[in-house]
UniProtKB/Swiss-Prot annotation:
Residues where heme binds: 461
PANTHER family: CYTOCHROME P450 1A, STEROID 17-ALPHA-HYDROXYLASE/17,20 LYASE
A Gene Ontology molecular function term of the record: heme binding
Cofactor: heme
Name the record gives this protein: Cytochrome P450 1A1
Gene: CYP1A1
Main location group: endoplasmic reticulum
A GO BP entry: fatty acid metabolic process
Superkingdom field: Eukaryota
Keywords in alphabetical order: Cytoplasm, Endoplasmic reticulum, Glycoprotein, Heme, Iron, Lipid biosynthesis, Lipid metabolism, Lyase, Membrane, Metal-binding, Microsome, Mitochondrion, Mitochondrion inner membrane, Monooxygenase, Oxidoreductase, Steroid biosynthesis
Biological source species: Mesocricetus auratus
Length: 524
């Protein structure tokens, strides 16, 4: 019996020694592999995570809310792990401006995510990790082409620019469609029609073409945009835990399907443009890019050429950014209008006073409609429908606010936290457009500049300016003619659904009443 106890004691001692040895070895390996923090700097703080999973469960279904809560505890620069991947999370307007603007070259990278490789075969200008001179030159080219066929003067039109012409046409269609639906059904889901009209605006700029609202090929693409947002939103687990890519995943399957359909749709349109291209007769953005491609020149400082594939990739980026963001902005705007009827009345009173009913609103009216602008800003701020920027990564070893961040580190930028910071806004949960107006009724430009939605710095949204103009003009034209409500007894659900863009539940009980006769001319 004593020999048995002795054996047990021996085994226990052996196991204990083995455990100590393994622990010490593991500790040594971790210390050896861990990036050495330069003297005077610190590693960003953060909570302890679970083995293998890291902080996946902490993020939950609403990562923007979870990380905002953590920022209150750990500060504007904190670190989490998703799987085994460390992620630095930035909050606070000053901190984010420091990173993306003042230290923009340090933070302009993109992480090499699996989901990003599925977008335009991994060659997307927006999602690709590349951020060198070739990328910068292509981005400038895309910006110039977008500007040329949006806010540049259209000599063949009475409108001030191409964008104004296209939006007026689509807004007029929506008004007549809503009126018809009211006469036939008595209520409708505005998103069903908004998404196609907004898509038609970017189609006109890219391809010089307008699609029917019942075009099945177009509908199959735009109706899958929610799946795109689910996968590309910050914190998508399969990007950080590779084994999850091989498990059944309906969102990932839909994402792959969407990208194939989207690329095929763009490829067909671009090929048709190549077939009908005439040098000197540039019809749209695609023609403009083809011309650059055939000239074999991109930028005098970048020794690269624009291949045929790159033309498609740039168009995919412009097209993708051009319909989802604007559609989401207008959709949220309508939700706020029906839940804040007093705000809607004030906007319409301003439109009647400044413009009247004898003509449509135009882009040149924007500076004279401060309350409408304040409403749009408050919609951007309160909804924060782009809660994070597309994830960034560091391009070199750097420091921020005294914290060391090594090269290649994934960085989340929490825009939602800025827009709901109580110190900045006082009552961030209240929807109050008046906060953006001065005592004299003009737009408060300083406060307006603190609303953060489209990113900052070298990776900011390429279509921000055009998107803002488009949202303004759509809303101005619609609200001049129509009053939006919901069917009596029905309520709208404004609970955000997380993704790259925050969505709300669809509402099929919208109503649109043609406004009673008002002043035909601006009031004195």
């Amino acid at each position: 019996m004593s020999s048995i106890y002795g054996l047990l004691n021996f085994m226990s001692a052996t196991e204990l020694l083995l455990a100590i040895t393994v622990f010490c070895l593991g500790f040594w390996v971790v210390r050896a592999l861990r990036t050495q923090v330069p003297k005077g700097l610190k590693t960003p703080p953060g909570p302890w995570g679970l083995p293998i999973l890291g902080h996946v469960l902490t993020l939950g279904k609403n990562p923007h809310l979870s990380l905002t809560k953590l920022s209150k505890q750990y500060g504007d620069v904190l670190q989490i792990r998703i799987g085994s991947t460390p992620v630095v999370v930035l909050s606070g307007l000053d901190t984010i401006r420091q990173a993306l603007v003042r230290q923009g070259d340090d933070f302009k990278g993109r992480p090499d995510f699996y989901s990003f490789t599925l977008i335009t075969n991994g060659k997307s200008m927006t999602f690709n990790p590349d951020c060198g001179p070739v990328w910068a030159a292509r981005r400038r080219l895309a910006q110039d082409a977008l500007k040329s066929f949006s806010i540049a003067l259209d000599p063949a039109s009475a409108s001030s620019c191409y964008l104004e012409e296209y939006v007026i046409k689509e807004a007029d269609y929506l008004i007549s469609k809503f009126q018809k639906l009211m006469a036939e059904v008595g209520h409708f889901d505005p998103d069903r029609y908004l998404v196609v009209s907004v898509t038609n605006v970017i189609c006109a700029m890219c391809f010089g073409q307008r699609y029917d609202h019942d075009d099945q090929e177009l509908l199959s693409i735009v109706n899958l945009s929610n799946e795109f947002g689910k996968v590309t939103g910050s914190g998508y687990p399969p990007d950080f835990i590779p084994i999850l890519r091989y498990l059944p995943n309906s969102s990932l399957d839909a994402f792959k399907d969407l990208n194939k359909k989207f690329y095929s749709f763009m490829q067909k349109s671009v090929k048709e443009h190549y077939r009908t291209f005439e040098k000197g007769h540039i019809r749209d953005i695609t023609d403009s890019l083809i011309e650059h491609c055939q000239d074999k020149s991109l930028d005098e400082n970048a020794n690269v050429q624009l291949s045929d594939d790159r033309v498609i990739n740039i168009i995919v980026d412009l097209f993708g950014a051009g319909f989802d963001t604007v559609t989401t902005a207008i959709s949220w705007s309508l939700m706020y209008l029906v839940t804040n009827p007093g705000v809607q009345r004030k906007i319409q009173e301003e439109l009647d006073t400044v413009i009247g009913r004898s003509r449509r609103p135009r882009l040149c009216d924007r500076s004279q409609l401060p309350y409408l602008e304040a409403f749009i800003l408050e919609t951007f701020r309160h909804s924060s429908f782009l809660p994070f920027t597309i994830p960034h990564s560091t391009t070199r070893d750097t420091s921020l606010c005294g914290f060391y961040i090594p090269k290649g580190h994934c960085v989340f930028v929490n825009q939602w936290q800025i827009n709901h910071n109580q110190e900045l806004w006082g009552d961030p949960n209240k929807f109050r457009p008046e906060r953006f107006l001065t005592s004299s009724g003009t737009l408060d430009k300083v406060l307006s500049g603190k609303v953060t939605l489209f990113g900052l710095g070298k990776r900011k949204c390429i279509g921000e300016t055009i998107g803002r103009l488009e949202v303004f003009l759509f809303l101005a034209i619609l609200l001049q003619q129509i009053e939006f409500t919901v069917s009596p007894g029905e309520k709208v659900d404004m609970t955000p659904i997380y993704g790259l863009t925050l969505k709300h539940a669809r509402c099929e009980y919208f109503q649109a009443q043609t406004r009673s006769s008002g002043p035909q001319h601006p009031q004195a």
